[in-house]
Amino acid sequence: MGITVLKNEGLDFHARISTPLSEIDDDIQKELLDLTKKVKIAGFRAGKVPVSIVKKKYGTSVRNDIIERRINHSVNHVIKEHNLNIIGRPKIEELQNEPDKALEFTVKIELLPKITIPDLKKISLDRPKLEVNSKDVEEQLEKLAALTKSYTKESKAKIKDGVQVTIDAIGYIKDEAFEGGKLNDFKVVIGSNALIPGFEKQLIGSKTGSEVDVNVTFPENYHAKDLAGKDARFAVQIKSVHTAEPTVIDEEFAKKFQSNSLEELRTHFAKQIENESEEAINTIMKMNLFDKLEKLLDFDVPESLLEQEKNILKSETDKNDQDESLLKDKSPKEITEYYNKLALRRVRIGLLLAEYAKSKNLQLEPDDLRKVIMQQARNFPGQENMIFDFYKNNPRAIEGLKGPALEDKAVQYIFNNEIKLKEKKYTKEELEKYLEAEEQRITLI
């Protein structure tokens, strides 16, 4: 076997490999002789089939198998001999495979970069810490009390904020009833903003038995695209009005929600408020870490990984509403630059974290995968069980989660053992503003 290195620069390794015709013919002959002992052909005793007959029947397929084996063996030999850290499958080009000539081909191999892990202990980040106060907890208790009100007392008085109204309604656009615009025995609490903006307000002052024309404009971002931004009129009949007695937040109230005391329910809500912000904080902390890492990384990345990541980005953009896309007003050049920069960032950081996990011998545990599946499920409120069943019944889908799960584990290890974290305290209101601003920023990356 002859090997001529054509290129060994950066992340590209190209070589021309040749195998003498005599070696190919010897391999074929050995395979054919072996087959004479195994094949059964009518007219010949088992193990006594002439080589010429076997060659005539199986010669082409035997040769193809030998060529494939020789190519694989040669490529593996080159990889081992040159100690190549490859990514993806080697490409075979310029194949010379005539029966009367030596086997020759060019192999093109893409390499993983040599990654030097930066000194992560030099990185410092602020970590938001929510300080839950009594006002936050009382607001949650009041919301719970409002949600659990029982509207049992019928009222003949005029409709006002806080009452529950039962209505029938038919929606019209330009005097034509539209699909999905009919409501029957629909209950709504006035002031809850459960209906289109402006709808509930126009019912105030009416009474049971009244017929009211409600004029509204569907929001531009309304889920039904054929209605978004359009003016509509609803012919509404008020069927009944009910009020509720104020809910008293006391020990008995707490017991309705599996709490032994009101103080225990308050503690539960305080913890819940903290937990609700934790996932958003972790996501933003991860992006802030990546911002720091991006500035420290300058190694070349494999072109195939870069193209793969750009295709993923384009696919994500295509799935999103084009009217809301960050790229909707960008020129083709600007869009290309955006994809190139973001793909490079993602690939570099992904390779670094994989190398870091390897250096620390981080291994995935069942709990790590469960966490990632839970994160996936939270993206589909109301369909969590469907997501759990999907992963339970699709082992291949689980395989696709192992990369993100190991990345998350590496990030958490870095937070716990490497970088300096400085706790920064926020009230609930302050944290909400901070998270909103940060979420808008990270949509760009």
Curated annotation (Swiss-Prot):
Record flagged with keyword tRNA processing: no
Keyword annotations: Cell cycle, Cell division, Chaperone, Cytoplasm, Isomerase, Rotamase
Domain PPIase FKBP-type per the UniProt entry, residue ranges: 162-247
Natural source organism: Rickettsia felis (strain ATCC VR-1525 / URRWXCal2) (Rickettsia azadi)
NCBIfam families hit by this protein: tig (TIGR00115)
Record remark on domains: Consists of 3 domains; the N-terminus binds the ribosome, the middle domain has PPIase activity, while the C-terminus has intrinsic chaperone activity on its own.
Recorded superkingdom: Bacteria
EC number: 5.2.1.8
Primary location: cytoplasm
Keyword Cytoplasm set for record: yes
Catalysed reactions, as listed in the record: [protein]-peptidylproline (omega=180) = [protein]-peptidylproline (omega=0)
Known function: Involved in protein export. Acts as a chaperone by maintaining the newly synthesized protein in an open conformation. Functions as a peptidyl-prolyl cis-trans isomerase.
One Gene Ontology term, aspect cellular component: cytoplasm
InterPro entries tied to this protein: PPIase_dom_sf (IPR046357), PPIase_FKBP_dom (IPR001179), Trig_fac (IPR005215), Trigger_fac_C (IPR008880), Trigger_fac_C_sf (IPR037041), Trigger_fac_ribosome-bd_bac (IPR008881), Trigger_fac_ribosome-bd_sf (IPR036611), Trigger_fact/SurA_dom_sf (IPR027304)
GO biological process, one term: chaperone-mediated protein folding
Localization, UniProt: Cytoplasm
Residues annotated as signal peptide: none
Name used for this protein in its record: Trigger factor
One Gene Ontology term of the molecular function aspect: peptidyl-prolyl cis-trans isomerase activity
Family as reported in the entry's similarity comment: Belongs to the FKBP-type PPIase family. Tig subfamily.
